[in-house]
Amino acid sequence: MKLDSAEEKSGVGCSLPAEGSPPALEPAFSKILNRLSRPKSSGQGGARNAALKDLGALIEAAEGDRFFEGSGSGGSLRGMPEILGQVVRALEKFAAPEEKADGVEEHPEVPEKATEVGSLFLKLLGKVEAAKSSPDCPAWKTGLRHMSGPVYIFAITHRLKQPWTSPASQHVAGEVLSLLLRVTECSSVAGFLCGENEDDRGRFAVVLGLLKPHLNKETWKKNPAVKHVFSWTLQQVTQPWLNQHLEKILPPSLLISDDYQTENKILGVQCLHHIVVTVPAADLLQYNRAQVLYHALFNHLYMPEHHLIQAVLLCLLDLFPVLEKALHWKGDTARVTTHCHEVLQLILTHMEPEHRLLLRRTYARHLPAFVKRLGILTVRHLKRLEQVILGYLEVYDEPEDETRLKILETLKLVMQYTWPRIPCRVVVLLKALLKLICDISRDTIPTTEAAKSTMLQEATDCLILLDHCSQGQVKGLLAKIAVSCEDSTVVSCIRKVQQGSADSPGDDTEGD
């Protein structure tokens, strides 16, 4: 502790402007770096706080035009840019949240640390901005290159609302990011990461290099912010910059998605989805990567979590074209839709007994997309689809009845693509649609008027299409009902079906 006291007394003195030459600045920053880098378990909290104050005074006292210069010789004198980079990394680590052993999400000490560190970063970036206008200080570019990565990670860690942030720390982090973009002459975060022009290679590789030690199986949970920084950063990078980093971004994304916590699974799947839609198919197919992605995503479909299912199905729908390309290239055109068949079969298996409304809604929301992708091959699943459609039309989904609207959309698509198989199902489908119209007309379902109106229109369209698929059978069956029915809404729908024109979606598909 005596040594700490001596350092605290002498830490600022060696950096006074009167001695502001680079050889004097380097040892002063090295001492502060040593104090910041001590293990947290050694009870040096007070010394660390004192080191932050000393660092702030040192930055303010140093001369701007000499701040980034250094000899880079003399053994331990590595040059100011490199030392500044190490100091900035130590500061970023100091302000980072840590995993709580008891599972508590709150990090009450982190926002204050982040606010202090953020103000130091603002001072450092201010020095860079001042040095840019000085023709006698070209070394600022080297200094900024060492600093920009850790400063960016700090800003992204603390700028959004998280368990380890406060309004004050979020504000400071936002200011740090804005100043960093201004100093690096970047118009956006994407420009900062990928480069603003052909000569600027960007800093995405640098950021990935800094995150890599914290994104392996043993370390990725020690800092709860790392996964968010990685995910957010990844999604700022688009084609054609992402594919060259595929080997670095795919393993962490798979690792995060394979976690037992649903939140992490969703985050990982979102990363995988961005990779699927951004990286060219040829790169995804190399080394069987696309197949690895498919199996990782397929396994998530067994988890009854609607947010996860939503993310997985969206990703799979974008992955199918990539997998189909591989089979086309192999000449196996008969099996190009194998993966889509597998997923739809599993979805229908889960949909039949499912009683949770959120999951039912999520499954139904994506059912039309699967029917569109399979087209006429949907006929393989027609029996299962019929059972799901009939069952789901009986249960309302307040307040907008999204589930039944999507089921009606699915039914229309099924009839369009598989119209030769529909006549034998006319009576069953007609009963289900009429029951739905009666329920809506009697106001027995607590949904909005707009939803009721839309459902009546969709159900009527389904009846018209069903009539065309059955070559007029529906009109004949409805004729007697129209005479005896006293419900004006039902009669109106029947009249629309009877007056249906020859043009219908069914006519467009008969030539397929």
UniProtKB/Swiss-Prot annotation:
A single Gene Ontology CC term: TTT Hsp90 cochaperone complex
Highest rank taxon of the organism: Eukaryota
Matching Pfam families: Tti2
Disordered as annotated region, ranges: 1-23
Chain intervals with Basic and acidic residues compositional bias: 1-10
Family: Belongs to the TTI2 family.
Function, as annotated: Regulator of the DNA damage response (DDR). Part of the TTT complex that is required to stabilize protein levels of the phosphatidylinositol 3-kinase-related protein kinase (PIKK) family proteins. The TTT complex is involved in the cellular resistance to DNA damage stresses, like ionizing radiation (IR), ultraviolet (UV) and mitomycin C (MMC). Together with the TTT complex and HSP90 may participate in the proper folding of newly synthesized PIKKs.
Subunit structure: Component of the TTT complex composed of TELO2, TTI1 and TTI2. Interacts with TELO2 and TTI1. Interacts with WAC; WAC positively regulates MTOR activity by promoting the assembly of the TTT complex and the RUVBL complex composed of RUVBL1 and RUVBL2 into the TTT-RUVBL complex which leads to the dimerization of the mTORC1 complex and its subsequent activation.
PANTHER family per record: TELO2-INTERACTING PROTEIN 2 (PTHR32226:SF2)
Protein name according to UniProt: TELO2-interacting protein 2
Source species of the chain: Mus musculus
Lineage of origin: Eukaryota, Metazoa, Chordata, Craniata, Vertebrata
